[in-house]
Amino acid sequence: MTLYEFFLNQKLVYQSSPHFNGVFLTILEHYGFQFKTIDKLWKSKLLITSELTDKIKQQLKCYFIEKIPLPYLLGTIQLRKLTFKTKKGVFIPRIDSLALIASVNLKKIKTALDLCCGSGTLAIALKKKCDTLDVYGSDIDIQALKLAQQNALINNVSINWIEADWFDCFNKIKTPIDLIVTNPPYLKKTQLNKTLNYEPKHSLVFQNKNSYFAYKQLFNLLLTKRSIKQLIFECSLFQKERLLNLFSIFKSRPIFNFQKQFIGMKVDNQKLPVVDIKNTKTIKQLLKMGLAGIVNTDTQMGLISYSESTLDKIKQRALNKHYVSMFGLEELKKLPKKLQQIASYFWPGSYTFIKNNKSYRVPKNLGLLNLFNAIGRVFCTSANISNQKPYTKLSDYQNDSYWIKQPCFIIRSTSKVQSNNTPSLVYNLDTKQLVRTTAKQTKQFHKLITKHQLAI
């Protein structure tokens, strides 16, 4: 029997299967028969042994009837110029992984991590792309790591393999990671079909969590590990809009495979995240995570946080120094009575008052007032390192190597904030003394006191 006659024989058995031709040619290739098209197979007069026909019949049955993935049946899969061994119980490499790696920008990248590496597809493809990279691959599955080691040998690359669950790998990696590439478990249990039933569930569904969980953790990781310059991940089309929205505070873009289908995202973390001042929900979430926001106030560039210790670390400032509490008008009722009495005469405005050793101010800007009404009271200080002056433009912080490594984000306002780059006047109500002021501020301050006949 010729190969083509055998093809026709099996075609009749599986004629309802649209992918039969491709599957048949792939199996033939596994046994050393190289035919790119059925036409070339037809022109061939090569014979096939009965022993081999029995093997191929069994493989076709397992694939089309029992829905066992072809790479498991053949024991290998070819992705362009890369060869990977496969094994039941270990996630099968996909061609889309190469599209992810094709999107990598290697500028300033020295170290890379394939998170949830499985059989090592992304790590190996990345090392092949740039041999000078220091590449790590981590996975919780020891069987997957053993297979990854074999695949690295097959493809003649050296990778650092780590057995670790998810972010635990960072405890074992002693060098900062510049790039993370990952194809994390992102499916719902309801999305598992018969073919996927043969693949390990932990590679498909993330720790019995929802399909969004892994990406939310990756989002948080970029915010807290500022050394990570780039994140590239695979996800499903159903998650596209939600993830584009989640990562919109970073410079990010979608990734498409070689068939122009959406398969994932590329996120640049080399600049500080940017959040619109009207996006109060996100700003509040980031502040709750322990980050600080850089915002243009009515006086200077300000740094706001829910935590005084966060501000201390960023500003490299001596501990136990107090910061100004800044808030919206809705918070006035919670202030000491003395402050409430004079509030309407000076606030909103560039006046800071100290009462009971605590400092308070309400800014004179509608955007800031709306923000603070939504997120509540924050600690505020000038956005500068101790003994240095703050910048006058938000963009300056994005070009400063110190600031882009800090746990900060930019709060962007479309309206023009009237900032004069002069700190607010500070008056201590307890000691009745001006603590900080300029000649111009002092004149205006006393003018208001006289006008309203205030006894402060």
UniProtKB/Swiss-Prot annotation:
Entry's Gene Ontology BP terms: methylation; translational termination
InterPro entries per the UniProt record, alphabetical: DHBP_synth_RibB-like_a/b_dom, DNA_methylase_N6_adenine_CS, N5-glutamine_MTase, SAM-dependent_MTases_sf, Small_mtfrase_dom, Sua5-like_dom
Gene3D superfamilies: DHBP synthase (3.90.870.10), Vaccinia Virus protein VP39 (3.40.50.150)
UniProt cross-references to Pfam families, sorted A to Z: MTS, Sua5_yciO_yrdC
Domain YrdC-like residue range list: 277-440
GO MF annotation, one: double-stranded RNA binding
UniProt-recorded name of the protein: Uncharacterized protein MG259
Species in which this protein is naturally found: Mycoplasma genitalium (strain ATCC 33530 / DSM 19775 / NCTC 10195 / G37) (Mycoplasmoides genitalium)
